[in-house]
Amino acid sequence: MIFGQRGSRDLGTEQPEIAHGTPATKMVVSGLRSQSGWEATNKALTFTPSPLKALTADREESDETSYRGGVTQGANLVPRMLFFVKEEGTTSRLGMSSGRVNYRSMRTPQEKSPWKSLPDLTGVIERRFIYDVHLGSTIAPFRALQPWRAILPINRDRLLEEEHIETADSTLAQWWHDATSRWEQNRNVTTKISLWQQINYQGKLTHQLGAPAHRVVYSASGTSLAAARLNDPRQVIEHKLYWIPARNLQEAQYLSAVLNAPLTTKTVAEYQSRGLFGARDFDTYVWRLPIPIYDSEQELHQRLVALAQRAEDVAGQTDLEGMAFQKARKVVRAALDAGGIHAKLNDAVAELLGLPES
């Protein structure tokens, strides 16, 4: 609703300043609605004034002097049962031809209808078409966990066009025929894109091919940021992760240190959407923070690299055998806390970003 005010015709009369922009503070309302009515609900709510941080598309720094322009979301490899597989041993007396493996769809309890009720995809595939894939569930702070395995129509760092998949290899052609048939028969009626368009939506798969030696990945959502570096350019990144290229090992460790600092999560929470258990989506909000480009001559940057190395050592030596990824992250963070690394990361990141220490 807009209220207008008629201006004075006397141009010589000083006019009050017109209200514009957004207020400096906001009122944060939290609590649960009471079934007893609004009066009881009002008593159950808390009202907390908080500084207002407005989201804006305006940028003070160009993509050449910040990391935000290089951040990319992973590929849409869903529905997962069409792509992710487990390798199986052969039952043939003659064994499997060299370079070929039996596969079966990898299934999880998190699958949704109608895909969870469909039978597995099974068959034989050339091993060169099976790729390691990292998802949100394969990343812990400062440590990449065991990647999943997926069949993808990629050959020599090139995503095969749909018409070329049929002629590239007979085993790949059979898998693609089976996968696309399932997709077309079971996709949502409002979904018009092909399976090929799905996996390369907005170029998120092709953008990864021919990747640099060092990349940093971080969780797209959650209550705490989890980031790790990858050093295998052939590994593929799924859409529950965002990734950013690094020029060298030290820059990758620098970024991992900044992203994994608890203070970073706390600061980014101001921008996040919120769910029942708190802030949830990180997306690219973290890059609204004034994170400077890595400079090896800066002592503070070197300190963050050293802290990342210590954190990687601690995370790598932590026993995570058999743990679900949520618990694995919790155990790694507890080890970093116990070693005093989180506190040192917070101190360094507060200095880097000009923030009050947590």
Predicted regions and their residues:
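Functionally constrained cores in energy, signaling, and assembly domains
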Residues: 1-4, 74, 211, 221, ...
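Flexible, glycine-/basic-rich loop-and-beta segments that form/coincide
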Residues: 1-79
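Generic low-complexity, intrinsically disordered sequence content enriched
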Residues: 15, 36, 49, 56-59, ...
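Non-catalytic DNA-recognition/assembly elements of restriction-modification systems
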Residues: 52, 171, 286, 290-358
